[in-house]
Amino acid sequence: MSKDIKILAIESSCDETAAAVVVNGRDVLSNVIASQIDIHTKFGGVVPEVASRKHIEAIGIVVKEALEEANVTFDDIDAIGVTYGPGLVGALLVGVQYAKSLAYALKKPLIGVNHIEGHISANFIQYKDLKPPFVCLVVSGGHTFIVHMKDYGEFDILGETRDDAAGEAFDKVARAIGLGYPGGPKIDKISNEGNENAIVFPKANFHDKDCLDFSFSGVKSAVLNYINKMNMKNEEINRADVAASFQKSVVDVLVDNVIKACKLRNVDKIAIAGGVASNTHLREAMINAGKKNKIDVLFPAPILCTDNAAMIGSAAYFEYLKGRVAPLELNAIPNLKLGER
């Protein structure tokens, strides 16, 4: 395709209101994010109704800023991309309705994007020459998957969590040891001061040796039990040791399973995606495992790991090339599965 395709992308699945302009799925002209983290920190987590109200306040502003920063107008835009699931239904609806209104008023194609596919596509922005097939570990507050990306927009799910997502476990453990919200970055930071071998927390292993699923409820419960026992004994809890030991348990399982996935599918490339992909200990462990097994390990920049609209613009471009235009009846689907249309 000789003509550059400019996508205006919108993301509002949780607590970030974001808009971006992306060219040909890989070049970001703008990536504007209005974060609500300071608001939700007061509540110890995301409050859905508050998130929705803040999206309504911010969405028009971030879209305007994204266009200005990219030095383009609506006339320059070829299609509107928007996250329509999974996520918080009220939050998703704000972005979907806004995108539908723009698409209708401007007579532009509307592209519905799966939020998880967006996270995976962040790697296409970071690595301009990256092409499928590859294995991707998607690890965030709400999702933990191992995916084989066979082609653009074509996925096999090789493994997923059977209970808590990894990021969810991080948040709950952080709250239990008094670190507050958001838990992931705080555990990552305090772990640098702790001994990761101080406490042995369990790692979920399933009977089927080829099983690539995860379970993080056990290690989360083990941490809570450890804290309760220490409190009953009136003994001081070393938060850094607890955080480091918990983190090691989670990271070890993530690394082991994704390396196993590459070997099972005979793939020599791993892309990491999602908010937890910013975790410095996960990055270090994945890089070391990749070197040991002669597998390339790819990470997006931290700004592309957390929720943003540039990744949605990338995914929307590849959907656009396949002719997957959404009807104006597009609705938010909070439990949307990867690969569903």
UniProtKB/Swiss-Prot annotation:
GO terms for cellular component: cytoplasm. Substrate binds at residues 138-142, 171, 184, 188, 279. Gene3D superfamilies: 3.30.420.40. Its main location: cytoplasm. Its cofactor is Fe(2+). GO terms for biological process: tRNA threonylcarbamoyladenosine modification. CDD domains: ASKHA_NBD_TsaD_bac. Fe cation binds at residues 115, 119, 307. Binds 1 Fe(2+) ion per subunit. It catalyses: L-threonylcarbamoyladenylate + adenosine(37) in tRNA = N(6)-L-threonylcarbamoyladenosine(37) in tRNA + AMP + H(+). Its EC number is 2.3.1.234. The keyword Signal does not apply. Keywords: Acyltransferase, Cytoplasm, Iron, Metal-binding, Transferase, tRNA processing. The keyword Thylakoid does not apply. GO terms for molecular function: iron ion binding; N(6)-L-threonylcarbamoyladenine synthase activity. It is found in: Cytoplasm. Belongs to the KAE1 / TsaD family. Required for the formation of a threonylcarbamoyl group on adenosine at position 37 (t(6)A37) in tRNAs that read codons beginning with adenine. Is involved in the transfer of the threonylcarbamoyl moiety of threonylcarbamoyl-AMP (TC-AMP) to the N6 group of A37, together with TsaE and TsaB. TsaD likely plays a direct catalytic role in this reaction. This is tRNA N6-adenosine threonylcarbamoyltransferase. It comes from Clostridium novyi (strain NT). The gene is tsaD.
